[in-house]
Amino acid sequence: MAASCGHKSILEDNVDRRVEDLLSQMTLQEKIGQLNQVSLLDGFSEEVASQIADGKVGSILNEADPAIINYYQKAAVEKTRLGIPLLVCRDVIHGFNTMFPIPLGLAATFDPELVQQGARMAAEEATARGIRLTFSPMLDIARDPRWGRIAEGSGEDTYLNEVMGVAMVRGYQGDLDDTTCMASCVKHFVAYGAAEGGRDYNSTGVTERVLRNFYLPPFEACVKAGAMSLMTSFNDNDGIPSSANGFLLKDVLRDEWGFDGFVVTDWNATREMINHGYAVDNKHAGELSMNAGVDMDMVSCAYIDHLEELLAEGKVSMKQIDNAVRNVLRVKFRLGLFEHPYADVEKARTASYAPAVLEAARVSAVESTVLLDNDGILPLDKAKVKTVLVTGPMADSPYEQMGTWSMDGEGSRTVTPLKALKDLYGDDVRIIYEPGIESCLDKAGKGVGKALAAARKADVVLAFMGELAIMSGEAHSLAEITLKGDQRAFLEALYKTGTPVVLTVMAGRPLELGFELDHSDAILYSFHPGTMGGPALAQLIFGDETPSGKTPVSFPKSRGQIPVYYNHNMTGRPYRGETLLDEYQASGRQTSLGGTSVWLDSGLDPQFPFGHGLTYTTFEYSAPKLDQVEYGMDDTIIAEVMITNTGNRKATEVMQLYVRDLVGSVTRPVKELKGFKRITLEPGETKTVKFGLPVQNLAFYGQDMVKKVEPGDFHLWIAGNSASGVPVAFSVY
C-alpha cells in the first residue's frame, strides 16, 4: 500500500513495533554505532569497511559508486550481529546526474509542480546508485547575495521557501512502497542565511520573534509534509551554536511540531563547537549535542569516541541514546532498507539521462530564466537576423553551466548555448563563435580583438557571461558581487561596436547589474541553468519559448544596499521619494528635519524587485475585487482580478498576491507574499483569476509570542511583482 513518506499511516504501527524490537536487542556499542556517520571523500576504504563490520557506523556519505556502496552495505547487513543496513547519503541538491537549474533558479520558476517533478527524477537517478537520503532542500531565508549559499535556496521570501521546500520534500520522498523513495534532510536549522556580512559560517543574531515569523516556517511546513531528517546549521545564533540549541531542537522541533525523524549535524559541526569557544574538547562537544537533541554526528567522531564514557559519567542518559537510535532506525524502516538494502548495479548503468528527465531539465531551465530588461531586441527574428556572434566565457562552458553542487553531473552531457544555437538554428542563421575571454576570471587577451572584429560584422551579439560554478555555494562568499575578470570591460567594448548586444548571465547569486544595463540591449538571467540550459536559452532568445521567470530575491543596485529585500518592516520615517545626493546644491544647509529612511546616493528601491520578470508581451491587471470587506477568523478571503495579455504573443505570467497588516502589536512588513499562480494567456485574451486566502494565513507571532491573527485593517495586492499593483482594503474582526 502506498503512503506519503514520513506521514503517519497504517504502516507506522508496524514500523514502531520493529524499531522497539530491534532496539531491545542492541548493545550500547551497537546503538552508538547507529549514531555515527562517516565520509568516503577519499574513495574506497577498507578501514571504513572494517568499522562497518564492527557495528561502528550507521551511515555513510560521499560515495556514489553502486558497487562500492554494495560492498559497504554487505559488511553492514551480513557481517554485523543484527544486520542493520547503512543509510547512504549524498548532496543531491538540484539533480543527480542530470542537473536541473540551481535551487535559486528553480525558485524563479514559481512552479512547485515542476520543482516536485524534478526532485522525483533526481531521486530516481540517485536511488539507482544506492543513495537513500539527500541533504536537501535548503530552507535558509537569504537576503544577502554576498553569501555563497544563496544559490542553494529559494531566496528571500518565507512563503516561497515554504512552497518550494515542500515540493522538493514530496518529490524526493515519493511513496513508502517504492525503492526510489529518497529521504529528505531539510537544512540548515536555523538562520544560517542571516550570516553577518554574508560571510559563510558567520554568527547570526536573529531574535526568537523574527525566527518564528520568517526563518522557521519553511522548516515547519516541510516537517508537516513528512521530511524524514533535519540538519543543524554551522552558525551560532545569539551565542548558541545550532548543534547545541536545545530550545530549537527539542522545544520547537520535537515538542511543538512533533518531528519524529532524526537530526544530523552539518559536516564536523559538533567538533567545531571547540572553535566557537563553546566546548572545551570533542567529548564536551558530544555531550552538548546529545543533550540538545542531535541524533547523528556527521564525521566529528564525538559520539563514537565519547558517548559510552559520557554515559558512565552520567552526563548523558541511556534514554537520550535510545531516543536518538529510535529516530535513526525509524527512518531506515520507513525507507524499506531492511527489505531492499542493495543498489541495482545493472539498473544504475541506465538510470540517468532519460529523455523525459532531460526534457524536464530543459523546461525547468526555460521557466527559471528571468528576462530582466529588453529594449525590444528580443526575441530575435530568424527572418531578419542572418549573422550572430556568440561570445563570452559562459557560451561553451559545460561544467560551469551546471552550477554549485554538481558533483555527479557530467560536463560531457551538458548542452551549452553554443552547441544548442548551432544545432537548433545553425541552418537558418550564421553562427560565429569567438569567446573573447576564456574564463569568467580572465583578463582580456588577444581573443578580445577577434571577438570585436566579429561583432562589427554581425547583426546581433549574444554575450554569455557570469560566474564560475565554484564562485557560489558553501564557503564561497564574495565581498563584491559584480562580473569578475575583464567581463565588464569586454561587454563595454562589444556594446561600443554599435551592434545590438543581448547579455545572458549565468550566476549563483544576484549580481550588481547597473553597468550591464547601460551596456546591453537586453539581459536574460538564467542563474546556473544545468544540463539543458543551452537549448532553453537558445529557444528563449529566438522566441520558440517565452520567458516567465520571476526574481526570487531582490537585485541590489550596489553592495551598499545589502541587505535589501521587499518584505522589510515600515519605519517611523518611510521613504517618500525625496531628493537624492546628486541633486543637492553644493551650498545646501545642513539639516535632518524631514529626512526619511533612504540611501541618499541610491534611493530605496533595488535594481530589480522581488517577483520581477518581463516577457515578450505585456499584461494589464485590473484592481482586485474581494467577495466582502470584513472577515471572521475562520473565513477565507476570495480575491479576483482580471488580467489581459495586451501584446501579440502567447505568454505566461506569474500573478502574485501580497498582503499588509496595517497595525499590529509589533511592527509588520510593508508587504508579504501570500499566494501566486502561473497563468498562460493568448494574445488579447482576458481571464478572471481567483485567489483563496484563509484568514488564518495572516497569523504571526506578536508581542505575546503567540501565533494568531490580530483583528484590524489590511491591504491586498495582486500584481506582477512586489513593487507594483493597486491595493484593496479589508478588515478582520
Each language-model region and where it sits:
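Glycoside hydrolase catalytic-domain context in secreted enzymes
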Residues: 2-700, 708-722, 733
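Edge beta-strands of extracellular beta-sandwich domains
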Residues: 726-730
